[in-house]
Design a protein with these regions (language model features):
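C-terminal and inter-domain tail/linker signature
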Residues: 1-151
Length: 151
């Protein structure tokens, strides 16, 4: 089990690598409805804000731990699999700005069974040792939306 950060002294890279490891464990254990969100919660501020592009099937703004749990449930309803194939930390947020993470995804849509490989670039703000804001940028939200809906 991934250990949560130890408060405000946790550097952003430690927080991010810990969160991504905890997220992988959470999803491997079945994700929403099957696994507890509790191991992920310490990595996120109680007031965390996640901004997803409105064009996505799980688009919108998600607030707090409950919002994050609802987001993971909505996302797992869309994707049968969502694998983080490769991840690169382009900026770690240690200079006061947001961290920037490039993740290459391979996913299979639950509704259509079709697969897509695509990059996601995220800006992530870490405040007091916890993730306070996440802004994912998908290369092509239209392709994701088209892939996930039945004709």
């Amino acid at each position: 089990m991934t250990k949560p950060p130890t408060g405000a002294t946790a550097d952003p890279l430690t927080v991010l690598t810990g969160m991504y490891a905890a997220e992988a464990e959470y999803l491997a254990a079945g994700g929403p409805g099957a696994a507890s969100f509790a191991p992920l919660a310490p990595f996120f501020s109680p007031d965390v804000v996640l901004h997803q592009a409105d064009a996505l099937p799980y688009g919108g703004t998600w607030h707090g731990h409950e919002g994050m749990e609802r987001f993971f449930a909505a996302m797992s309803g869309v994707w049968e699999s969502f694998d983080m194939v490769e991840q690169e930390f382009l900026a770690t947020g240690e200079t006061g700005g947001p961290a920037v993470v490039l993740t290459r995804i391979r996913a299979r849509a639950r509704a259509t069974g079709r697969e897509l490989a695509f990059p996601i670039l995220q800006t992530i703000t870490v405040t007091d040792g916890r993730i306070a804001e996440v802004r994912p940028f998908y290369w092509d939200t239209g392709a994701v939306a088209d892939l996930t809906r039945l004709p």
